[in-house]
Amino acid sequence: MAEVEEIYNLACPASPIYYQHDPIKTTQTSVIGAMNMLGMARYNRAKVLQASTSEVYGDPLVHPQTEDYWGHENPLGLRSCYDEGKRCAESLFMSYYREHGIPVKIVRIFNTYGPKMDINDGRVVSNFIVQALRNEPITIYGDGEQTRSFQYIDDLIEGMLRMMTATPDDFTGPVNIGNPNEFTISELAHIVLELTGSKSKIIRMPLPSDDPQQRKPDITLAHKMLGDWEPTIQLRDGLLK
């Protein structure tokens, strides 16, 4: 009997402040990490899931984003260590599937939040909540009209589990796992202020380079292949958790 039957390759910093701190290590984590997990899967004949990202779509020109969209991403920018590392990992997974017959699963994860997030994580949900609870200024980068789709962690986990257990071995994905309800960053800030009762003011800072202007998953394929999967926890309810 195999020592390992299923592998979930989840390792990589996903917050821009972390992955840009050491971009070489970030790329190595995605690429070498994928090779290590694929080698283990081949040795054990195990099924292996790659936690990819909506960042492979870059600053998309197609909206919402479907899995067959190749993306609009800057391969030389500050974010590319993360984006290109994940794209390379997807390529490695498909190469192992074609060459060695390893049952691989690729999911592209959209913005996810939940309890126990690091207060210094640097991503927008944790930033806004921490700032609001401290009555510090809420920092919006750019005009606040850029959009994101926020997914509660429980919905993500359910989607990944279904990808591993409810799809045939010859179905590799990729599959978008995300909440298709879209909010502007300004809307998110006002929701956080309302839910926390904070007296924080909103301030605006320059938008970082290559920051996507819109992000929203098309989850048609997930609904079809993952047993009618769709997010069940909406933004306000998730933020209260």
Regions found by a protein language model. Give the residues of each.
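Acidic pyrophosphate-coordinating catalytic loop
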Residues: 117-118, 212
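Amphipathic alpha-helical segments in well-structured domains
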Residues: 34, 125-126
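N-terminal Rossmann-like NAD(P)+-binding domain of SDR-like oxidoreductases, especially those catalyzing
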Residues: 1-112, 132
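Short glycine-/acidic-enriched loop or helix-start segments at secondary-structure transitions
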Residues: 18-19, 59-61, 116, 150, ...
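C-terminal substrate-binding subdomain of Rossmann-fold SDR/epimerase-dehydratase oxidoreductases
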Residues: 36, 111, 132-241
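Conserved donor sugar-nucleotide recognition element shared by glycan-biosynthetic enzymes
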Residues: 81, 89, 121, 185, ...
